[in-house]
Amino acid sequence: MINSSSKKNLISTFSSMFTICIVMIFVTCYETFQQDGEPFPIRGPLTRITVKNNNDYLLGIHCKSKDDDLGFHIHKEGELYGWKFHVNFQNSTLYFCGFSQGQDNKGVFDIDRAERDFYRCRNCTWNAKKDSLYGYSNLPQTVTWFFKWLK
């Protein structure tokens, strides 16, 4: 006959073994699951950001998050600038970008704030125009957000 203490130890052992098996299955299958050619995200869905320069001048763009500095880039009229990332588990991912025309600062704006944009778009498009920066939703392709240039 199994006493109460032995029964608890047996249940604890089986529970630990079950947990280890689940973790091993997940680790083994991790690379099998793909999303748009990327490994299955542990944190959150894959998001793509694209900024198009629709101005007749060179547009400077410098984007960052808490963890990543994407560097400064200069784009001609019609050129695209973009990157992709996974939203973090806490849904607090934030990318902000500074825009400039030569020495003129056009502004620094939150280009992707997960709490604001999580349902707005997965492929987020921003168009830099003469007066403002316009953000579009996935469907329908309508302006849902815009930032007015400082100058």
UniProtKB/Swiss-Prot annotation:
UniProt keyword annotation of Signal present: yes
Keyword Glycoprotein: yes
Glycosylation sites: N91, N123
Cellular component aspect of the GO annotation: extracellular region
One GO process term, biological-process aspect: rejection of self pollen
One Pfam family from the record: Self-incomp_S1
UniProt main location, coarse: secreted
Transmembrane segments: none
Domain of life according to the entry: Eukaryota
Subcellular location: Secreted
Keywords assigned: Glycoprotein, Secreted, Self-incompatibility, Signal
Similarity comment text for this entry: Belongs to the plant self-incompatibility (S1) protein family.
Protein name per UniProt: S-protein homolog 27
